[in-house]
Amino acid sequence: KNFSDVYPDKFTNVTNGVTPRRFIKLANPRLSDVITEGLGTDKWLSDLELLKGLIPLADDDEFVKKFAAVKQANKVDFSNFAKRKYGFDIDPNTMINTMVKRLHEYKRQALKILSVIADYADIKSGKVSADDIMPRTIVFGAKAAPGYYLAKQTIQLINNVARVINNDPDVKGKLNVYFPWNYNIELAMNLIPATDLDEQISQAGKEASGTGNMK
């Protein structure tokens, strides 16, 4: 702060951001093509204000069909990637519900897995019929600091819950949980384009930037 007071012109604040060139053009070329077709230009890649031109297309049935087809194709691609890379059997016809972010108490991955446990318990107790729920696949992606014991315990909990749920025939095809290891850019570029529902439930006032949802 002292240096900033003396040399204010030498300091600037740049928050976290997301590059559309990587997370749309490179990671999601199908969506990129649909956007370019809808806008009639690819200049949106360097001027995201142009994306406002998509708003009227939300009521265009043909555009919506193309958008939905892109999402389904991406889900199939991710399912194949997950099988090849991790041995996971992910059904691309289920809703893919993701929570990808640094593992931390304030980001509340523990709260999310507790909600999954509650849903599972409701099905097993007969309180809710498995046939009445939206078939969903929950995918966690995260890393924890080496010495962060509670975060490591949360990862263990998620994997233990996944092991139970994924091997229970009562919820087969209705509820599945996966935690692919070593979350990295390769996984992000395959998972994010396939995501139907992205969870952002960090404790209010704690999230510094929150770029995961932008991707």
Where are these regions (language model features)?
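Catalytic cores of carbohydrate-active enzymes across secretory and cytosolic contexts
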Residues: K1-K215
